């Protein structure tokens, strides 16, 4: 399978250690910093998540149009397309995947004028492995709760 700008990450040695609840979760990590991207990917894989990685916002947007993800973790300042630009496209396309913005400078001025661009969570860089995993778990729990509520509401009308 050819993926332009997307780095597919799989680790068969981690497969035996997968947490049951995480094994079906697919996360997209978007970051132009190779070290941060690879460390994030490794931590998530070791915790049982299926992970895809993109080297910038444009590659991340391409992945979002091609594959289904349960969560996106993105930097903001990247070449070709920023994390905010990718988030704006995601929201305009009415994609409901939750987004964690992992950045050293969160552009709060953007959120003041465009509140719909707020990510579901922010992760201040540099961040620890524990901070990353706790934020991922918190956002996924919140999204699961929201999805269950929506499904319950719609089940009454179907």
Task: Please report, for each region that a protein language model flagged, where it lies by residue.
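Charged docking surfaces used in two-component/phosphorelay signaling
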Residues: 38-46
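Short hydrophobic/Thr-rich beta-strand motif most characteristic of the beta2 strand and flanking loop
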Residues: 48-55, 63
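Non-catalytic signal-transmission and effector/linker regions of two-component phosphorelay proteins
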Residues: 1-26, 130-158
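Active-site beta3 strand of CheY-like receiver
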Residues: 67-73
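Receiver (REC) domain active-site loop signature in two-component systems and cognate sites
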Residues: 78
